[in-house]
């Protein structure tokens, strides 16, 4: 064998000592029965999904299901079909794992940070009975809505379990919500009681008179003597969590378990415009979703989960339900994302579910640490990275040698035990996914879902090493793509069928709370939920998200952008005759392509004494670009655009967008996909400029 | 028991044949993949748990093996990753060292062994697929043995016959040579996977042990080499070095990528008589003292050198 360098030869020689050893694992002699699978009409080789006809009479085969449950959608855990509600799920966990660690926090009662201290499943169970009984004691009735308005900590889950056990409806509120949104949600859901922390209590008290439905405010982490006393006649009681516990303990009530079809929670989503929408989810919805996911990804009592994503988000909520089912120990972060790495080192979790934003930070941190580690270490890293990547691509088991040499030290940064990484909420770039798989040597899987589907619609299957897609349907739902002719997406598209992603099954929500109109817009008569996302089917029945149906997209940090609104602002600028705003979920900022007004440009250049031969040259002049962008910024501020709605770079083009050059519709709207392709080079150049002017942080 | 922490990853450890308290250690930076090397000469403090370094020598590339001269108590020879073989005299001041350097091997030199009976020559084996014979008084190698088809990981002199040696190679063969003959005298396809190490029995000049990537140690009799005398199973990964005891006829020590050091009695049915899990990285170097019965030394990628008495815990101090 010939190698490019001595170090590669040495690495390969030693690696072969370790990897070519005969295996003791006898399982390799077991092969799947190929005949059985090819005999079934459902299965295709190397497929993750099966395709079925939507209606027997029309015979169009366009509905995809997971191959793990092709004939019946999963609605209960296969091993425990008796679990129909969140209450059943928790009771099952308490009976099975009573003595196991469940909820852990490192924040002590005096606010200092230490080792994790744990509450067992059994202890959490008796605490949730006390909390539920305490709520009854204060006159909260079955079916009433109870708000949770604080960040992740053990009490959050105890209260949530209390709601399930006594048939209250839990309504989570992001701790970051402003007063207006909180006021809206409290009134819209007619909340009777709300749990908060001292910080969020002050927000509530600032508009107490405007939320008349509230009868009880419970302060978590506050001492009774420090709680404000309210004037008589307000009808509102403020108690500490501790006091509610003792009140409940002294008047324990038996559970009033919900039925699977009862409402478990109302999750308010921010939406792009207007007021929050309340997504109504039943116990059956949530159990179905988690049961479906559990077919492909199992959690075990030996697992340790780190909870830091907001519990008000369906992604974290669903993970918690899965954790309870598996008897997992859940450790909470100390409340500060910047100290998350410290929490990792102490907790040493085995399961880590996060969002691309954090994975991107980890990626940036490691790559820049490698760059600054010196020539030798950098070279070692590169060799190890490429070798392991090749092994994974070629379907071989990568050498343990590379892990020992390079990657175990990186893995230690997350505590060293992570075996499963999940990513959701926005797309993870394939580069970063490959990087995580190689550096952390664990299963890294991306999922796709939304609150309206109780979380997961599709997720990558175990052992699927292709990145850049969101996997096959959750066994608890079926998925089809519906043609969107106005955007040129059809089922006949080559090479892959495309269309709007529609979902049906036991995971679909009951509707938006008190909003039938919006419910009808998203949920059709046949029970299909229209997601508004455009997808395509990759070979093997794996879904890839490629666009949004409405001209709305998400930036990398998760903010929604309605580009037309921003374009309308910028076209007010004197230099701008037409404007195309571009952004996507791999970048955290917007860029603009501006077709300039030639007359204004000429006059301005003359007044500034700038010489030029033709308009194109003027457009490329950095001074001109800077001036135009500065004026655009002024207009943006005037129109009160939010920070992420500002274009961070601009490219000026002399020619207008027209019907003839294919950039406009007959109604003079910008054809976005075409414009994106047409200006692809300019767009990537602008992002490169932005990246160059904002060096990435060098530390995690 | 004495422990020494080296700045680099350990590759080999050898007891001096002249002083019971002296050892030489071969080490390499970055696991011997890339970077410098260093040779340490260590002294065990009598009756105390300490180890002191009497001298160390830096090299420009990894040091994979080291051996003591059998004729001069202060001389040692090092096998270097850049293909060179260097001779050091610890009696001379550091600037005079190395006293010799031979640049003949085209690739990494993996082992060096001093002739214990003639005491005037030594062998080196290399990843250039050759074994070379050297004499202390010659300016270049005396002879090159080129038959193996892949890296030669170790070449060891027979303890009785000063002209006979064995070589272990990644081509899955063990070869026996007599330097008076033009080619190898015996080829034993000893394992189905790479052979990483071999050693002669000190009491029976016809018996050898080999260790391999196949995780086993095998014991062979050259008079009937069709089947091994014993196959020793117990390591979880490739066995990097194997060594016969100088004091007990049937005792063998081995160390492995599974991070353990094992002791075997190949004559008894339950051959595994001891296992030491003191290393936290690949254990790649092992030796047994000729002068003190039962005294063992090991080193590994955890940068630690342990010296301990058989049957004791290497970590206990």
Swiss-Prot record, chain A:
It is an enzyme of class 6 (ligase). It catalyses: a long-chain fatty acid + ATP + CoA = a long-chain fatty acyl-CoA + AMP + diphosphate; decanoate + ATP + CoA = decanoyl-CoA + AMP + diphosphate; dodecanoate + ATP + CoA = dodecanoyl-CoA + AMP + diphosphate; tetradecanoate + ATP + CoA = tetradecanoyl-CoA + AMP + diphosphate. It is found in: Peroxisome. The keyword Ligase applies. Its cofactor is Mg(2+). GO terms for molecular function: ATP binding; decanoate-CoA ligase activity; long-chain fatty acid-CoA ligase activity. CDD domains: LC-FACS_euk. Transmembrane segments: none annotated. One of its GO terms (biological process) is fatty acid metabolic process. Residues 526-550 are annotated as: Fatty acid-binding. Keywords: ATP-binding, Fatty acid metabolism, Ligase, Lipid metabolism, Magnesium, Nucleotide-binding, Peroxisome. Its EC number is 6.2.1.3. Expressed in roots, stems, leaves flowers and germinating seedling. Preferentially expressed in seeds. Activation of long-chain fatty acids for both synthesis of cellular lipids, and degradation via beta-oxidation. Preferentially uses palmitate, palmitoleate, oleate, linoleate and eicosenoate as substrates. Can use myristate and linolenate as substrates. Functions redundantly with LACS6 in lipid mobilization for beta-oxidation during seed germination, which is essential for postgerminative growth and seedling establishment. Belongs to the ATP-dependent AMP-binding enzyme family. PANTHER family: LONG CHAIN ACYL-COA SYNTHETASE 7, PEROXISOMAL (PTHR43272:SF90), LONG-CHAIN-FATTY-ACID--COA LIGASE (PTHR43272). This is Long chain acyl-CoA synthetase 7, peroxisomal. It comes from Arabidopsis thaliana.
Swiss-Prot record, chain B:
WD repeats lie at residues 58-98, 104-144, 147-187, 190-230, 234-274, 278-317. Gene3D superfamilies: YVTN repeat-like/Quinoprotein amine dehydrogenase (2.130.10.10). Expressed in siliques and leaves, but barely detectable in flowers, stems and roots. One of its GO terms (molecular function) is peroxisome matrix targeting signal-2 binding. One of its GO terms (biological process) is protein targeting to peroxisome. Disruption phenotype: No visible phenotype, but reduced sensitivity to indole-3-butyric acid (IBA) and inefficient peroxisomal import of PTS2-containing proteins. It is found in: Cytoplasm, Cytosol; Peroxisome matrix. Keywords: Cytoplasm, Peroxisome, Peroxisome biogenesis, Protein transport, Receptor, Repeat, Transport, WD repeat. InterPro entries: G-protein_beta_WD-40_rep (IPR020472), PEX7 (IPR044536), WD40/YVTN_repeat-like_dom_sf (IPR015943), WD40_repeat_CS (IPR019775), WD40_repeat_dom_sf (IPR036322), WD40_rpt (IPR001680). Coiled coil: none annotated. GO terms for cellular component: Cul4-RING E3 ubiquitin ligase complex; cytosol; peroxisomal matrix. Its main location: cytoplasm. The WD40 repeats are involved in the binding of PTS2-containing proteins. The binding of a cargo to PEX7 is necessary but not sufficient for the targeting of the complex to the peroxisome. PEX12, PEX13 and PEX14 play a critical role in this targeting. PEX7 is required for PEX5 stability in light-grown seedlings. Interacts with PEX5; interaction only takes place when PEX7 is associated with cargo proteins. Interacts with PEX13 (via N-terminus) and PEX12 (via C-terminus), but not with PEX14. Receptor required for the peroxisomal import of proteins containing a C-terminal PTS2-type peroxisomal targeting signal. Specifically binds to cargo proteins containing a PTS2 peroxisomal targeting signal in the cytosol. Cargo protein-binding triggers interaction with PEX5 and formation of a ternary complex composed of PEX5 and PEX7 along with PTS2-containing cargo proteins, which is tranlocated into peroxisomes by passing through the PEX13-PEX14 docking complex. Belongs to the WD repeat peroxin-7 family. This is Peroxisome biogenesis protein 7.
